Amino acid sequence: GYITSRLKEMQDKFAFVGDVRGPGLAIGVELVKDPVTKEPVDDTTMERLLWRCVQHGLFYQNAHNVIKLKPPLIITMEQAAEAMNILEHCLEEAV
């Protein structure tokens, strides 16, 4: 779907996006320090990213170094695009 394809584009753009995985709208985005070793980013980086996203209106859960996106099943394309734009902008700033 659209969200997964946008996240895969971010994975290609940012070396620290180590993996994008999950079925349907239950998506995990793993952030790493090194794309080869897959060493996780630190908790401070994850916290900084979360707060930047919250400031822009995007809320998500994280489990250590994995962003857990679970948008509602009724999300519109416009809402999905806005969420992905916010996430991409915040990834550029926070990591």
Descriptions of predicted regions:
Residues 1-95:
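Conserved N-terminal phosphate-binding loop of PLP-dependent enzymes in the Aspartate aminotransferase
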